[in-house]
Design a protein with these regions (language model features):
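Bacterial Sec-dependent N-terminal signal peptides
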Residues: 1-29
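Long, intrinsically disordered, low-complexity segments
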Residues: 18-19, 99-102, 189-191, 211-227, ...
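Membrane-proximal, proline-rich intrinsically disordered regions
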Residues: 19-65, 116, 359-381, 586-601
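Conserved, well-structured interaction surfaces
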Residues: 39, 44-45, 77-154, 171-206, ...
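Short, surface-exposed recognition loops and adjoining beta-strand edges that mediate ligand/DNA contacts
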Residues: 60-76, 152-167, 203-244, 258-346, ...
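Inward-facing hydrophobic residues that define packing positions of alpha-helical scaffold repeats
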Residues: 106, 187, 194, 269, ...
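Extended amphipathic alpha-helical segments enriched in small hydrophobics
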Residues: 141, 249-251, 451-500
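Flexible, polar/acidic helix-loop-strand segments at domain edges
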Residues: 374-459
Length: 601
């Protein structure tokens, strides 16, 4: 044993002697910026962080804090915030820390990108610099937008402020006690970054077949087809492109031109409409609407056969599919969470009666209109087909099973799917169907997993953005020089859904010259088309709509002459008026006296 210890000690001493400075700082595990110049993989990790930290929720989360849904998970932070727990120190919608950290990485990358040797070939190296710089600008814009959306707002002294804008890498000597830039300044800086990205990036990543197809600027520096395809070819699909940056610019403009911000943003609805039109014109405008775009999540032939980085006609930008078991990947987490109990799910997201009532009749009339033909005794008959596609209601047929949410007395129909039967039952009388794949099985004895994709931007969202902004700028039938109007877009989207197709959409025709009624319809179409995609929380706020609409449900019981439908209050929301704008984090307010808090927080 003594000999063994001596040998070990000798070996250790030899090791220490050979590596006498191994314990000096910044040697083994801490690499300096200079090392990035000759190690492109190391340098690209900074940009990779920007992608890894993209602020997109991979499932419906914030909808349960709106009038569209509740959850039976009573520990949900989003549910708690809707019930009164939202504060500057308890904020599920907070973006400050993650976005600021990501921007630091991106600023560092932008400061060194043109010093890194990305390729030994001069022309290919320059193409890499252009592409990577463009991606970094777009990602920085995206992160600043999410900061602005979550934390921009009006202060007690009447200023519309955004967030502190930082464009250089920060170090220990940097000035961190920065005031907030104005909201208008923030929007302009975001636009500047997006314009730089648009100038540097290709419309799409695609291979070329000859040097003659090279962009002129790359022909002039002697680039070759092979180098171009390496940098801008199909292998790069899924990364940010010019098309994606243009779509994002339209989203930013729509927020800034909305009622909650327009008085201080400097952005007009005309600008927002034209930015959206730029994106839509690239797919032929109205003719580019995907006939199956409203059911993108259940178009299994497209989802299962989509190649690496490819998109469908509806999806403008998406995340990657993998073979993991996590949400939205090759798995069934979404289905396990949201299938009804009889399908081995936890029934988490429960659509509200409020949302159900927003779906019109198939003839296009709202259910409150005397011409609708709606019957309170048969409320799901002859409704907008999207109601059946997005929501499971009482006696819906799904996966070969009839889903009974009513409180029937007979044993045959009395299941755990009924209202409030067990902890995983619906609280509203409805279950989620949208986003879920019907061909998945959560049955432990026959699990069946399928591909899912995190969808970041849909073309339908851009069409709706155009309709909203165009109606505000030019009225329902004006087009501002474009080839289609808000009316044209809404008519096409409703026709795709099967709404108003048998009567020429008589309701739409009756309001097409009324700007205010068209505004209501456009907002309602957006609510329906984008439900459960984490849009409603922000839409309510940017439109300055009331925050405290009570979440309602339905109790269905068997009466002597049929079913009896009784509306019920499920959650009484507890927002304050100042909560149209989110807070600056309390911890930041304690640290920096140059920060000004939004009014009320």
């Amino acid at each position: 044993m003594k000999l063994k210890n001596i040998l070990l000690s000798t070996a250790l001493l030899a090791t220490l002697s050979a590596c006498e400075d191994m314990f000096e700082p910044a040697q083994e595990n801490n690499r300096g910026i200079e090392e990035m110049f000759s190690d492109p993989n190391y340098a690209s990790g900074l940009l990779g962080y920007g992608y890894a930290m993209l602020p997109y929720d991979n499932s419906s989360v914030s909808d349960v804090a709106t009038d569209d849904a509740v959850t039976n998970d009573l520990t949900s932070n989003y549910s708690k915030m809707a019930l009164g727990a939202w504060s500057s120190s308890n904020n599920p919608m907070e973006q400050w820390q993650a976005r600021r950290a990501t921007i630091q990485y991106l600023n560092t990358f932008l400061s060194i990108v043109d010093q890194v040797q990305w390729s030994a070939t001069t022309s290919t190296n320059q193409m890499y610099i252009d592409k990577l710089r463009g991606e970094a600008y777009a990602l920085r814009a995206l992160n600043n937008f999410y900061l602005l959306q979550a934390h921009g707002g009006w202060t007690a002294d009447g200023q519309l402020l955004g967030v502190p804008m930082v464009f250089e890498p920060e170090d220990k000597d940097s000035e961190f006690n920065l005031p907030r830039n104005t909201f208008s300044d923030c929007v302009n800086y975001i636009f500047e970054d997006l314009d730089k990205a648009i100038d540097l990036l290709p419309l799409d990543y695609a291979n070329i077949s000859s040097n003659a197809e090279l962009p002129v600027k790359y022909q002039q520096i002697g680039a070759e087809m092979g180098g171009y395809n390496l940098v801008f070819g199909t292998y790069q699909r899924g990364r940010i492109t010019k098309r994606i940056a243009e779509a994002f610019k339209a989203q930013v403009a729509l927020l800034a031109a909305s009622p909650a911000y327009r008085d201080g943003s400097g952005v007009t609805s005309e600008m927002a409409a034209n930015y959206a039109a730029t994106v839509l014109n690239r797919i032929g405008g109205i003719s580019g609407i995907d006939p199956r775009g409203n059911t993108w999540y259940m178009n299994t032939d497209e989802l299962d056969n989509m190649g690496s980085g490819e998109v469908t006609a509806e999806i403008l930008w998406r995340g990657n599919r993998t073979n993991g078991d996590a949400d939205w990947d090759m798995g069934i987490t979404q289905e396990k969470n949201n299938f009804p109990p009889t399908l081995y799910g936890s029934g988490r997201i429960n659509p509200t009666q409020n949302l159900v009532d927003a779906f019109p009749m198939a003839n296009g009339f709202p259910i409150t209109d005397v011409n609708s033909g709606y019957s309170a005794n048969n409320p799901y008959a002859n409704r907008d087909p999207r109601l059946t596609e997005y929501i499971l209601y009482n006696e819906s047929e799904y996966k070969g099973k009839k889903i009974i949410t009513g409180l029937y007395a007979d044993s045959e129909n009395k299941t755990d799917d009924g209202l409030n039967r067990i902890g995983t039952s619906t609280r509203t009388g409805y279950y989620l169907r949208k986003l879920l794949r019907e061909d998945c099985s959560a049955d432990p004895s026959s699990l069946n997993t399928k591909y899912h994709f995190p969808v970041r931007i849909r073309y339908t969202e851009i069409f709706l953005a155009y309709a909203e902004a165009a109606n505000d700028a030019w009225g329902p039938t004006g087009n501002g020089g474009n080839t289609y109007s808000a009316y044209d877009v809404i008519k096409a989207l409703r026709a795709r859904a099967g709404v108003g197709t048998d009567n020429g959409d008589a309701y739409l025709e009756s309001i097409k010259n009324d700007k205010d009624k068209m505004t209501e319809l456009i907002r309602n179409e957006r609510r329906i088309e984008l439900c459960f995609e984490n849009k409603r929380f922000w839409d309510i706020r940017r439109w300055n709509l009331p925050l405290n609409e009570t979440a309602k449900g339905v109790r269905i019981e068997q009466g002597n002459n049929g079913l009896i439908y009784t509306l019920i209050d499920v959650e009484i929301r507890n927002y304050q008026d100042y909560m149209h704008y989110g807070p600056i984090p309390y911890s930041e307010m304690l640290k920096w006296d140059n920060l000004q808090q939004n009014k009320g927080w």
